[in-house]
Amino acid sequence: MYRNTLEIPALDVSVIYIAQAFKAAVILGLLCLLGFEYLKWDMLSLITWNPYGLLMAWPILLWAAAWAGANTMTGRYDQKFKEARTRILSRAVWTSIQIGFWEELIYRYLSFGIAMILLPFIDWITRGVVRWIFESFLMPATHLMTFGALEGQILTTPWTVGAGIITANPVFVAAHVYTGHSIISCVNAWFVGLVLFWLALHYGLITSMVAHSVYDAVLLLTQALKAKCVKTRSRRLPV
C-alpha cells in the first residue's frame, strides 16, 4: 500500500489511469447508444484549448503553493526515499503530467457525460424527486459556493448540465480521499474540482489539463524537494 503519490512507480500510475479511463469510456459509449439525446452539452466542443484560461487559473495555482507550504510546515512532507533526488524530481514531473491529462479526461469529460445521461433516467424512476433535489437545494448551494462563476452552466442550461457537474465532482473528490483522509482534504478537492470544471467549460478541456498538471507539479515538486533521499550503495561481489 502506497502512502503518497510519489511512491507509486510512473508505469503503475499510467496503468491505473488507463484502466479507469477505458472503463469510463466504455460506459459512456454504451449510454450514448441508448440515450444520446440526453447529452445536453456538445462534448466535442470541450476538446479545445485557450491559453488565456491559464492566466485565469492563477487562484488554484496560488492555492497549490499555499497548500504545499502548509504541508511542509506541518511535517507532512518529511519523508524518506531510497532513490536519488533527480529520479524523484523527474517522477514528480511525469506523474503531474499524467494526473492532469487523465483526471481531466476521466472526471471533467467522461464522468460528466455519464452523469448527464444517467440523471434523467434516475429522475424518471424517482418520479421527479432527483431533479427537484438538484434544482431546489444542490444547484443553488453550488451557485453560492462558487460565487456565481458557474451560473451559465448550473442555473441557465438544461438541469442535467448543472446536475452533471455536481454529480461528477464528488467522484473526483472520492478518488482523492487517500491523499489526506480528512475533511479539509475533501473540501480542498471539491473546490479545486469545481474550478477545473469552470476552466474546462469556459476555456476547454486541454486548458484544464495543463492547469491541473501545473497544480500537481507544485505539490509534488515541493514534496520531492523536501523529502530526504537516502542513497543506497550497490553491493559488489568479492573478486
Could you describe each region identified by the protein language model?
Residues Q20-L34:
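A generic, lipid-embedded transmembrane alpha helix
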Residues N4-I18, L34-I106, L110-T157:
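Juxtamembrane helix-loop-helix connectors linking adjacent transmembrane helices
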Residues L89-V239:
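Transmembrane helix-loop-helix hairpins at the membrane interface
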Residues K23, K40, K80-K82, K226-K231:
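Context-gated lysine
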